[in-house]
């Protein structure tokens, strides 16, 4: 089995989009350049290397395509490519003019380890503006089940070819040529519906102002629509500039995301590499049944050509950008847009619920922590939007045995700054009465701070809030977040798990602090509100249920259930994609293994920019799996209403996540133990 750190072990494959220097009508020199770059792709561990359209002959040679000397030289160059590919790992996808029957075809050849796997002719030939391909070539549309003679051997020929790796799960290559992408019903779409997970596009495409942007839009859209990876390579330096110019654009997209793009207008050969996630694509197709449904009723009969890649077994790194915080993009513009949408989703959801019920007042518990703070500023904005006074927010802080003066002061300051109807109810006396009546050791004066001690406080707070809502004709606003729901870090029933409407239920913990920063930075409220919010951001995350000695650190949530940074990472890849624990650990190692590598979200505190090694990742992933799969589903099965916020998913039993309350975590824990090393 491949090393744990090998990308090929976890459903990835490395692909390359290449542009060589062209030599018009000189196939021998072009083959030499292709082979040089192919060797570099092999050294880089690539599985597929895509070259430009007609790269063996060059694209812009006009009527020289019809010269026997050129066509014979093309076949000789192909013979050399085939022979010298024998010691190379990647499937080489190259473009060449080939004779078949009585016509000439603009073809893409898939070459691997000393043989031509197959030849795909271009279907759609542009014959407008600067293009006049029909002068030289015939369309390959409709050609299926045929063979073509190359170097004395027959190879499959037609638009019905897919190339499938026997030893790399889900690596299935489909090919289209330049204009094939630009038509409404592209050959690549049919190939994807027939099973292709990687689409290669060999392109000539001379450059004009704005065309690079159009190509990028098309390739990204194709990868998203077809749930595939799209590898694009356009002709570049060396092509004839008699009437046109060339930029050599190369790009790799996956499911609507640009993974990599190479330099344009380069005088040197370009090799653009990225690691595509075949497992992700397979899961997307599995989850989105409409993808498979859309292929039914279409004549999609393809020949699958098998090959063995023999992928590298060692550590090649991972050539793709990974967000440390999958719910929090590092790009400032993207983060600002996400925060705008997330906040307004929450506000709009609550406003609609208040309108639908005719309720004018809300009750909310405010602790001075992140979750209740964010919930309160959502409530305030919702009432503003409905034209209701903020005095209709009945905000209560309910200090218990471990409530710190700092968090209580922050709660009072925020409630006052927002203009709510604020009140404090100390629950310690009521909690002591209950614990004494239960004959709990604490009621006898013993310092026993067990889960019962904690949940009596959490339950009393919720009990008060619901009775206050009854008394005032209001609804209770839940403040618990998506991360706490995933980990079961909430008190069930008469506790913080329950409310009339949970505004934070779709918001992960790692996003909440950025939402609050966005609220401050965009001036959603008066400056005094912003100052209080900034103070709250500096507070340690703690349930404040267990008393601590003077000067000691308060009870730490993350010390018990794990760092939210890692647990939100684990949640995202479990919920959104259903990845196995070993793959999640592999991804976490690349995202979190080096604090100095990659981008951090803007304004993320420098002292908190840490790293996690594999043993830490393994440990906290185990905690996540036990709590998520084996312990906490019963709490989510009775989840109150609240809006879905993130594309990463939500945990409502009426929406994204439906699971049995009596499930077991054992299969996931066994996979973790079996496939993730301890060091």
Question: Can you say where each PLM-predicted feature lies in the sequence?
Answer:
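ATP/NTP-dependent adenylation/nucleotidyl-transfer catalytic domains that generate, transfer
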Residues: 30, 169-171, 226-228, 237-240, ...
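Enzyme catalytic cores with a strong preference for nitrogen-chemistry domains
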Residues: 1-365, 381-390, 422
